[in-house]
Amino acid sequence: MRRAVCPGSFDPIHNGHLEVIARAAGLFDEVIVAVSTNYAKKYRFSLEDRMEMARETLASLRGIIVEPMGEGLLAEYCRHRGVSAIVKGLRSSSDFDYELPMATMNRQLTGVETVFLPAEAHYVHLSSTLIKEVNVLGGDISEYVPKSVLKRLLAGEPPTEPSRKG
């Protein structure tokens, strides 16, 4: 079985993410959407909410598993889950410059390869941060996020602090 992981914080998941994950699902038998938490970041949505939004929006795709990544190195997570490839979307050359050293390190640590998928032109400008900023300022983001995500963003819930379980 060819298994890949699409890691990210997905705060929130948007149509650019969905497009890359759908393309990955066409390349691999199983794609794990690994929702990460960086304890140095302030999140708009809790880990549970981010996972729920991902599950809701990806439910129609076969072979998709949504789970928390947990703490630690992505390469070790891949080894533990039997993943042969990490799939990353690239919006620009600066994304490539950022991702290439990590891809090289992941391959050296555990042999896991990184597959880069260029973003569709319609989504190259998207980021979760930009979507949250435009939303807070009253802009229309409905073209860029799934309806279930839009509903949550418009509900105006306060940002959440990541919780350490332990």
Curated annotation (Swiss-Prot):
ATP binds at S9, F10, H17, G89, L90, R91, E99, Y123, V124, H125, L126, S127, S128, T129. Its cofactor is Mg(2+). The record marks H17 as: Transition state stabilizer. GO terms for molecular function: ATP binding; pantetheine-phosphate adenylyltransferase activity. Disulfide bonds: none annotated. It is found in: Cytoplasm. It catalyses: (R)-4'-phosphopantetheine + ATP + H(+) = 3'-dephospho-CoA + diphosphate. Its EC number is 2.7.7.3. GO terms for biological process: coenzyme A biosynthetic process. Pathway: Cofactor biosynthesis; coenzyme A biosynthesis; CoA from (R)-pantothenate: step 4/5. It is an enzyme of class 2 (transferase). Substrate binds at S9, K41, L74, K88. Its main location: cytoplasm. Keywords: ATP-binding, Coenzyme A biosynthesis, Cytoplasm, Magnesium, Nucleotide-binding, Nucleotidyltransferase, Transferase. It comes from the Bacteria. Gene3D superfamilies: HUPs. InterPro entries: Cyt_trans-like, PPAT, Rossmann-like_a/b/a_fold. GO terms for cellular component: cytoplasm. Belongs to the bacterial CoaD family. Reversibly transfers an adenylyl group from ATP to 4'-phosphopantetheine, yielding dephospho-CoA (dPCoA) and pyrophosphate. HAMAP family: PPAT_bact. Homohexamer. This is Phosphopantetheine adenylyltransferase. It comes from Paenarthrobacter aurescens (strain TC1).
